[in-house]
Design a protein with these regions (language model features):
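Bacterial Sec-dependent N-terminal signal peptides
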Residues: 1-21
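Right-handed parallel beta-helix/beta-solenoid
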Residues: 18-46, 53, 63-65, 100
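Active-site/binding-pocket entry motifs
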Residues: 30-31, 102-104, 112, 136
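Short, solvent-exposed loop/turn segments at secondary-structure boundaries
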Residues: 35-38, 71-72, 110
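Residues at the C-termini of beta-strands that transition into short coil/loop
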Residues: 45, 99-100, 109-110, 155
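Short hydrophobic/charged patches on amphipathic alpha-helices used for structural packing
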Residues: 45-48, 118-119
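Beta-solenoid repeat scaffold
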Residues: 51-106, 122-131
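Right-handed parallel beta-helix
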Residues: 67, 73-75, 112-157
Length: 157
């Protein structure tokens, strides 16, 4: 009996690990691509539209010059550059990470929404993991509250 449970757990673990997908984003990518290492997406927005719990988005090295028209949303106070609203689970997080030893850099010098705080990564989803990338030149454009955020966590885990 214990042997059958162990074998079942082994195969279930293999099945679960097979269901996770790796997506890739690169400065030379195209959002009509499949999001693979050889044919990466161009934007995090496209990658986020595809991910499900357990998936990983690898961000290739290079400088991503973000433009204001690429912003995903906002409210009366904030402009969201990347609105990260999809959730992983406690057991199957969604990971956004720089690829291997490469260093992706998100340059926000051109994002200057008038009278708003800039939230580069506005995180409203839960069980998301971010690592191994830089965010530079985030602008402060609101006069009443001189604050902008690289990562703003809106109550997620």
């Amino acid at each position: 009996m214990k042997k059958h449970i162990g074998i079942s757990l082994f195969f279930m673990g293999c099945f679960l690990s097979l269901s996770a997908t790796n997506y890739f984003v690169a400065t030379n990518g195209d959002d009509s691509n499949a999001g693979t290492l050889d044919k990466p997406f161009a934007t995090l927005q496209k990658a986020q539209s595809k991910v499900v719990p357990g998936d990983t988005v690898y961000i290739r090295g290079g400088e991503y010059r973000i433009r204001e028209e690429q912003m995903m949303g906002g409210d009366h106070l904030r402009a969201y550059v990347f609105e990260m609203n999809k959730s992983g689970t406690q057991a199957k997080r969604i990971c956004y990470t720089g690829y291997q030893d490469e260093r992706p850099i998100f340059n926000l010098a051109e994002v200057k929404p008038e009278g708003k705080r800039v939230s580069v990564f506005y995180v409203s989803g839960s069980y998301l993991h971010f690592r191994n990338f830089e965010i530079i030149k985030t602008q402060v454009t609101i006069r009443e509250h001189t604050q902008s955020e690289c990562i703003y966590n809106q109550g997620g885990n």
